[in-house]
Amino acid sequence: MQIQFHLYNTLSRTKEVFNPQDQANVKMYVCGPTVYYNPHIGNSRSGVVYDLLYRIVIKIFGEKAVKYVRNITDVDDKIIDRAALLGVTIDELTDKVTKEFHKNMAYLGCMLPSIEPKATKHIDVMIAIIERLIAKDHAYIADNHVYFDVLSAPNYTELSNRNLEEMFEGVHVENSKTKKNPQDFVLWKPAKQNESANMNFESPWGLGRPGWHIECSAMSYKYLGENFDIHGGGADLIFPHHTNEIAQSRCAFPSSTYAKYWVHNGFLTVNGEKMSKSLGNFITVRDLMDKQIQGEVVRLFLLSSHYRRPLDYNDKAIEDAKKTLDYWYRAIENINVQKIDLPHDFMQSLLDDMNTPLAVKIINDYAKGVFISKTEEERQLNASAIITCANFIGLMNKTPHEWFNSGVDELYVNELVNKRLEAKKQKNWLLADQIRNQLLEEKIILEDRPDGTTIWRKE
């Protein structure tokens, strides 16, 4: 029986059965970071959501059949401005932030994409597409800029499902007397005086750099061709970025449909408010790493809500994710777990538009099953289901001992435990209690066993 994967398509505004153009060559493109500032937790949601989608598609079609492209935007006005502010070169800034992004993705347990192209390495492809658009009267040169003629694009509003006036309400539009229409967007912009040379490139229109939207059209075309299966990104990219991508790609290649399925993850707020530097609630992934919050905790938090729904970051949500993982790890402790086939109900939850809240509930049910099981066989079966399901969504990649003792100096704790055992042998109960209390203050819990040994764990 063929697996049916239902995925919500923003383009049709319905859940559709995912049917790739070629099951032996499934193609997926996701908008990656603009590397001017350390990624924030909103960026990380996109990383985790599309990592899960990648895992599901691999499960269905096989790893060799799936090509996942996630770009790096390393040419942008924001990059120029921040490099100038910090007094560093463009390359120094983009290299540093790109490395930080990779560390963040590893911390969150994300698999590497098949290809991770950088915009600056694909300027030739962008220029070639812009030339096609000019030749087909979809773009024009004005005041040393190249603009895309929005009114020349059929079905421009299809993705956003709004009329043109509504789409541009409240959106900053760079005005120019030389534009045909206020809504026309830039494909190529000229270099400014005193700008860094490595942020500008030679072109038929003079020294300059590409607009943001053309970058993704070029890189997706280079690695996936005119048509591909999935295009992912945050809901904030529906307009203008993805809308403009579709317009310029379809106009450059009239026989193409561009991406077949458009997938968008919801917004992330902090304590109920939009995240912003001015509100002082801008949280980077590095902030979480520095607080020694384990990556699995953040990943589970990001998967705790359906990917299309808004998600609020707050201390309680992180605490709840930690408690859930503690419960799961405690459930498999001291049990000989084995990898088994993915349980049917768990897989079905993910095949229904990546219903992660239901998937998490199913793992919780297996954990509960461990604690109420009457036989060792039942306990082992439930524990094996926990680890199999959790591993599939990128969780529980540690042993229970590693999990509960993460960040603990084991040599130090073991030394105190042995010192306490010696004190008990000498019937020095005062010292034994002092050591127990000292460790308790450091959130280390001791458990004395009937055989005279003592085990410990982090609270």
Swiss-Prot record:
Reactions mediated catalytically: tRNA(Cys) + L-cysteine + ATP = L-cysteinyl-tRNA(Cys) + AMP + diphosphate
GO-annotated cellular components: cytosol
Cofactor note: Binds 1 zinc ion per subunit.
Major site of localization recorded for this protein: cytoplasm
InterPro entries reported in the protein's UniProt record: Cys-tRNA-ligase (IPR015803), Cys-tRNA-synt_Ia_DALR (IPR015273), Cys-tRNA/MSH_ligase (IPR024909), Rossmann-like_a/b/a_fold (IPR014729), tRNA-synt_1_cat_dom (IPR032678), tRNAsynth_Ia_anticodon-bd (IPR009080)
Sequence positions that bind Zn(2+): 31, 216, 241, 245
Keywords, in A-Z order: Aminoacyl-tRNA synthetase, ATP-binding, Cytoplasm, Ligase, Metal-binding, Nucleotide-binding, Protein biosynthesis, Zinc
Cofactors named for this entry: Zn(2+)
One of the Pfam families matching this protein, by short name: tRNA-synt_1e
Motif ('KMSKS' region): 274-278
GO MF terms, alphabetically ordered: ATP binding; cysteine-tRNA ligase activity; zinc ion binding
Residue ranges of the motif 'HIGH' region: 33-43
HAMAP family the UniProt entry points to: Cys_tRNA_synth
Family, per entry: Belongs to the class-I aminoacyl-tRNA synthetase family.
Summary of subunit composition and partner proteins: Monomer.
Protein name as catalogued: Cysteine--tRNA ligase
Species the sequence originates in: Rickettsia conorii (strain ATCC VR-613 / Malish 7)
Gene that produces this protein: cysS
